[in-house]
Amino acid sequence: MPALSQPLSKSLLLAAIATVVGIAAASPALADDVVRLGNLKFAHYGAVSYIKEIAPKCGIKIEEHVFPKGLDVMQAIIAGELDVGAASSEAAISGRAGGAPIYVVAGFAKGGARLVARPDAGVKSVKDLKGKKVGVTRGGIHEVLLAAELAQNGLSYADTPGKDVQFIYLAFADLNQALLGKNLDAIMQSEPQSSQAINKGFGVEVIKPYDTPIGEPVRTMVMTEKFYKERRPLAEKFMRCFVEATRTFIDNKALAEKYVRDTIFKGQISKEDFNDAIGNSPYAYDVTPEHIQITTDIMVKYGIGKMAKPPIARDWVKTDLLEQAKKSLSGGH
């Protein structure tokens, strides 16, 4: 018996060593395929979230981190905690101006803003906001759109009393509650929250704020310069996965609705909320340097983001990965 156990132990030992070596060899490969993604919890950010569901078949693993607002995504990028992030164009522009080493590599939705008033506030147009309190989230595209709309209508504004319109800065998650509680007269809100306010009867649409030079604001996918330059094969895989997830949401509305309503919002939004939200913030892929430059110029004009050195869009909007991904997936949409 002892004679038999000797070779057996040796073979077990060799097998164990082989397994450990195998794991050690495999681990770096697995670690190499992880993409750290920053995201926000909105209906039109749903396709970005869906990337993690199809990531295994793309040959990657997504670590999704959800933040309250886009500027938080930029802070995490500066801290070296993310490879890619989803944010409004304004947050990306402020981030780049503030030293975030990022490129805009795609758009993923457009629109996603609505000026909503209390039904009893007597606000039928932007001009009616004179003397009112308007809630908005600081550092989102919504603040830029609100400033542009007020300026177009000859109204002054500040976050203290004394101007035509008083801004009250609140998190996106708190705006509806403040409107419902009649602490505000109107809010510039995202989706699906603005649709919810209207469908639940405590808000009425004043305008969708797309008549400024910005038009419908594009939400941006940003990538760190390091990831774009040094992790090219993984960046290419990620972009193909992004295009595939987005295309799936555009083509299969039922799947998109189920995922956003059940997985992201855990049944807190209705079918009507989802349909109205996506009607006002459709999924997309594209972004242009021109759009980012106009948005930058408007931010500078109204002093939003307070950038010492506004970035030049053509230096940091890089859509080559997107175009390549769209081509490789049968030509895109």
Mark where each language-model region is.
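Bacterial N-terminal signal peptides that target proteins for export
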Residues: M1-A16
